[in-house]
Each structure stands twice: as structure tokens, then as C-alpha cells.
UniProtKB/Swiss-Prot annotation:
GO terms for molecular function: rRNA (uridine-N3-)-methyltransferase activity. It catalyses: uridine(1498) in 16S rRNA + S-adenosyl-L-methionine = N(3)-methyluridine(1498) in 16S rRNA + S-adenosyl-L-homocysteine + H(+). Specifically methylates the N3 position of the uracil ring of uridine 1498 (m3U1498) in 16S rRNA. Acts on the fully assembled 30S ribosomal subunit. It is found in: Cytoplasm. One of its GO terms (biological process) is rRNA base methylation. This is Ribosomal RNA small subunit methyltransferase E. Belongs to the RNA methyltransferase RsmE family. GO terms for cellular component: cytoplasm. The gene is rsmE. Pfam families: Methyltrans_RNA, PUA_4.
Length: 198
């Protein structure tokens, strides 16, 4: 049987009891419609994933016991997505898909052609957690504060992949496979493309 997953940013261990935060009470009771003795999966990136059984549900509290470890924590390859700040719905979709595909760090970029200069990091984190729960990952990507493209390029020493639609293809991604042992960063520009002066 496949159980619902919940990301918890707390220490997890077999046979331990865990009190879930108030935010989860509504979600577990009303959205998932779980009751006492029902099971769910609880996970985080540092301890892994555990099968948990609900032992108590109150108006504002919910307790579970972690029965058994289902997955051990693991280290993912470093894969950064530096994405221009675009319209909210499109940015959320990009963040969701990037999370499901295994991106480990997301950096919102401020470019000359950006329509927006700020981003709601808390909202992005909620999107990342939901996508992590759906995609069977253990580690949600880290979301950094927005930075200008110029500053990002100055401080970055990763291998950067960038598709320039105005240039003829010089190298296929298959030809650079020998470089893929390095940390990789992918840059996605705004809808109008990146200006090299950015």
C-alpha cells in the first residue's frame, strides 16, 4: 500500500514519538482524512524516510510513532538551477518541475529583462516541499535569496549550462559528458531571453 508523505524538518529515528506542528494537523485530518492507527510516511533529507502510525489526534495536536525506516538518507549530486524571476505561476511551475527532476539548489536571478525584482522565498519553499513529497525525493532543494546575474556569475565556479537560442550549436551536451563530474549549474533566462550585458 502506498502511504501519503510528509516532510518534517526534525530529527527522525525508529521507534521514536513525534508531535507534528499545528500546520500538519489540519492537513492530516481534513485533507488526507487520516485517523488514529492510520499510517503515513514521514521523511527528511538527513534521517531518511519512516513509516509512521498516528497515535493521537487532537484539535491542535497530532502524534505519531515512527515504526520502521523505509529509506536511508543519501547525498545527491550538486545540480543548481539559476532561474530568472518570471511571472509567479510560471516560476512556481519551473520550481516544481526542477524539484521533481532532482535540482539540489535554486537561485532566483535578477536580470535586465526581468519583470520582477523580488520573490517570495517562503512561497517558493512551500512549492518545493510539495514537489519533494510528490516526487519521492528525501531532500528538498535549497532556495537562496535572489541575486543579480552579474553577481551570480562572479561567485559561481560550477560548470554552467546555458542554451543561447541566438547562437549556432557548437557543442551538444553529449560532447561535454566528461565535464559532468563537476558541480553543474543551469541558467534559465526570462521570457525575452538573457542579454549578455546582464
Amino acid at each position: 500500500m502506498k502511504y501519503n508523505r510528509i516532510y518534517i524538518n526534525s530529527n527522525l529515528a525508529e521507534n521514536s514519538k513525534l508531535e507534528l506542528a499545528r500546520d500538519y494537523v489540519h492537513y492530516v485530518k481534513t485533507v488526507l482524512r487520516l485517523k488514529i492507527h492510520d499510517s503515513l510516511r514521514i521523511f527528511n533529507g538527513s534521517d531518511g524516510e519512516f513509516l509512521a502510525q498516528i497515535t493521537q489526534i487532537g484539535k491542535n495536536n497530532l502524534s505519531v510513532v515512527l515504526k520502521e525506516q523505509l529509506k536511508k538518507a543519501y547525498i545527491e549530486s550538486a545540480l543548481t538551477l539559476a532561474v530568472a524571476i518570471i511571472k509567479s505561476d510560471k516560476l512556481m511551475l519551473t520550481i516544481n518541475m526542477a524539484t521533481q527532476l532532482g535540482i539540489t539548489k535554486i537561485i532566483p536571478l535578477i536580470t535586465r529583462r526581468c519583470q520582477f525584482r523580488t520573490v517570495n522565498i517562503e512561497r517558493l519553499m512551500k512549492c518545493v516541499i510539495e514537489a519533494t513529497e510528490q516526487s519521492e525525493r528525501l531532500n528538498p532543494p535549497i532556495i537562496e535569496q535572489a541575486i543579480t546575474l552579474k553577481d551570480y556569475l562572479k561567485k559561481n565556479n560550477n560548470l554552467i549550462l546555458y542554451a543561447n537560442e541566438h547562437e549556432k550549436v557548437k557543442h551538444s551536451i553529449l560532447h561535454i559528458s566528461s565535464l559532468l563530474s563537476k558541480d553543474i549549474a543551469i541558467i534559465i533566462g526570462p521570457e525575452e531571453g538573457l542579454l549578455m550585458m546582464s
